[in-house]
């Protein structure tokens, strides 16, 4: 791998460990020329199904869009970046595991809600209020009551 500091091709791995529940390998590397250290992440490149939007349009799965949506729901909540990445990896893994070439966006929304429910109840309600299109306070109350069970 090329050194990001001096562009030489000679780098060596000084530490490797599994992260994201074993779906990624984190490698600590050192350049043999300039001796700078840097971190790389390695993941298997697998096909993620296309997303069928509610209007019938199809678009490629966009992990950045998923991340932005989850981070928006979690804004100012005490959830670590590592936990967010684990949730994203879990959702992506579940989408791949369907074995389908295309999946409805509703499936992605449901998977996000499941992960947010585990991460942070407030973020779950924030996301659910938009995703489920709450129109009045009773719908909020009903969803909050479900969380208490």
From Swiss-Prot:
GO molecular function, one term: ATP binding
Cofactor names: Zn(2+)
Keywords: ATP-binding, DNA-binding, Metal-binding, Nucleotide-binding, Repressor, Transcription, Transcription regulation, Zinc, Zinc-finger
Top-level division of the source organism's lineage: Bacteria
Any Gene Ontology biological process: negative regulation of DNA-templated transcription
Disulphide connectivity of cysteines: none
CC cofactor note: Binds 1 zinc ion.
Zinc finger (unnamed): 3-34
Domain ATP-cone: 49-139
Keyword Heme: no
UniProt entry tagged with the keyword Zinc: yes
Protein task: Negatively regulates transcription of bacterial ribonucleotide reductase nrd genes and operons by binding to NrdR-boxes.
Family: Belongs to the NrdR family.
Name of the protein described by the UniProt record: Transcriptional repressor NrdR
């Amino acid at each position: 791998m090329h050194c990001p500091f001096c562009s030489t091709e000679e780098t060596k791995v000084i530490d490797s460990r599994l992260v994201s529940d074993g779906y990624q390998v984190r490698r600590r590397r050192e350049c043999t020329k300039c001796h700078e250290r840097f971190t790389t992440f390695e993941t298997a490149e697998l096909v993620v199904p296309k997303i069928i939007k509610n209007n019938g349009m199809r678009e490629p799965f966009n992990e950045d869009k998923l991340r932005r949506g989850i981070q928006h729901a979690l804004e100012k909540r005490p959830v670590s970046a590592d936990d967010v990445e684990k949730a994203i990896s879990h959702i992506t893994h579940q989408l791949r595991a369907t074995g389908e070439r295309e999946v409805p966006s509703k499936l992605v929304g449901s998977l996000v809600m499941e992960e947010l429910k585990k991460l942070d109840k407030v973020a779950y309600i924030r996301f659910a209020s938009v995703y489920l299109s709450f129109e009045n306070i009773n719908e909020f109350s009903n969803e909050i009551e479900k969380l208490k069970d």
